[in-house]
Amino acid sequence: MQRRRGRTERARKRRRRSSGSRAVNESYRSEFIELRKWLKERKFEDTDLVPASFPGTGRGLMSKASLQEGQVMISLPESCLLTTDTVIRSSLGPYIKKWKPPVSPLLALCTFLVSEKHAGCRSLWKSYLDILPKSYTCPVCLEPEVVDLLPSPLKAKAEEQRARVQDLFTSARGFFSTLQPLFAEPVDSVFSYRAFLWAWCTVNTRAVYLRSRRQECLSAEPDTCALAPFLDLLNHSPHVQVKAAFNEKTRCYEIRTASRCRKHQEVFICYGPHDNQRLLLEYGFVSVRNPHACVPVSADMLVKFLPAADKQLHRKITILKDHGFTGNLTFGWDGPSWRLLTALKLLCLEAERFTSWKKVLLGEVISDTNEKTSLGVAQKICSDVIEETHAVLRKVSDMKEGTVSLRSQLSLVEALRMEELRILQASAEILSGLLAPFS
């Protein structure tokens, strides 16, 4: 007779089955113990959130108890926030006040981070600095041969980002030289490009929005960035909603959940309704099954499959430019966007119906021929981008085999391209369905 399994055995089986997907509590690690002490000294009250390692998202925060909708999950006192006010009150303050033209709020924060990182054990912010990433995966940090594998729109933005950071560093070297009295080592070795890039990425990827009072000694650029220790361990999910703001009454930066979260689950915040190219550019990661993910279509790709003999093509392109229809043209999980199809419908207008272009922009159907032709062009564009994506993925696979040092960077590109491939395949299927009635 077969023995019946009891509750204990069933529970054991469930634990074994889920052991590979469970979070690992990391609150026992020395760096997090020190961070807790540091936060407590600054009046931070303990929360039901603890650092943990999660499969898929890496390090994040886990809830020790169920969170209810509307509950404050983190309340970080002003004394824990790293702002430009922190910088001005530090030993850097007198030098910043003297420098002309005034440094920007961003440069002030970056300078402080480099200085405090260099100070090591002498830094009052050591407990926070120790839990920050040693390196980042934003495109500005990627090797040129890896950046070349990014989709064209993202590659262009990545190159702009790199140039912007390099320009900021170069223009700041004169200011850095005035800080020599603060350091025993040559200031050039302290404020290296590598150290500055780390600081810039720290601010760019981890800062929360906090409008600070205007500092007269800083430039007029918006002063809206604050680093928030512990709070910045929260990972992004496009599927959650939270309310984050500075509470003027409590003088705390608060995050309030807008949905429930079960005990021992990872707690997320949402950085915004960003697509994956934006997430990779600004934060250095890709979100799987991101509902906001899309594949952009360039203006050049729009006309690639149109008949070269169309005498009205130049006029059509001008109309699209004048009415803002040459940007934000995308394929998404639900197929080609309305803007993409509208642009293609106008480009595919027959000569005798060209005068109806205003109706096209208003979303009106002009003719079955126009509908079929524009959908056909969309299908060709989609197929072309699918082929290109497959080719890049093959190249990434080959490079991962031959260049071990670049594997982590290549895996990031692979994740982006794979997600975009899934979107394109979903769009291709939808386009086939839309074209079926015309066949």
UniProtKB/Swiss-Prot annotation:
Family the UniProt entry places it in: Belongs to the class V-like SAM-binding methyltransferase superfamily. SETD4 family.
UniProtKB keywords: Cytoplasm, Inflammatory response, Methyltransferase, Nucleus, S-adenosyl-L-methionine, Transferase
Organism annotation: Mus musculus
Tissue expression summary: Expressed in the forebrain subventricular zone, in quiescent neural stem cells.
EC id: 2.1.1.-, 2.1.1.364
Protein function: Protein-lysine N-methyltransferase that methylates both histones and non-histone proteins. Via its catalytic activity, regulates many processes, including cell proliferation, cell differentiation, inflammatory response and apoptosis. Regulates the inflammatory response by mediating mono- and dimethylation of 'Lys-4' of histone H3 (H3K4me1 and H3K4me2, respectively), leading to activate the transcription of pro-inflammatory cytokines IL6 and TNF-alpha.
Catalytic activity reported: L-lysyl(4)-[histone H3] + S-adenosyl-L-methionine = N(6)-methyl-L-lysyl(4)-[histone H3] + S-adenosyl-L-homocysteine + H(+); N(6)-methyl-L-lysyl(4)-[histone H3] + S-adenosyl-L-methionine = N(6),N(6)-dimethyl-L-lysyl(4)-[histone H3] + S-adenosyl-L-homocysteine + H(+); L-lysyl(20)-[histone H4] + S-adenosyl-L-methionine = N(6)-methyl-L-lysyl(20)-[histone H4] + S-adenosyl-L-homocysteine + H(+); N(6)-methyl-L-lysyl(20)-[histone H4] + S-adenosyl-L-methionine = N(6),N(6)-dimethyl-L-lysyl(20)-[histone H4] + S-adenosyl-L-homocysteine + H(+)
Gene Ontology molecular functions: histone H3K4 methyltransferase activity; histone H3K4 monomethyltransferase activity; histone H4K20 methyltransferase activity; histone H4K20 monomethyltransferase activity; histone H4K20me methyltransferase activity
Domain SET: 47-272
Annotated compartments: Cytoplasm, Cytosol; Nucleus
Name under which the protein is recorded: SET domain-containing protein 4
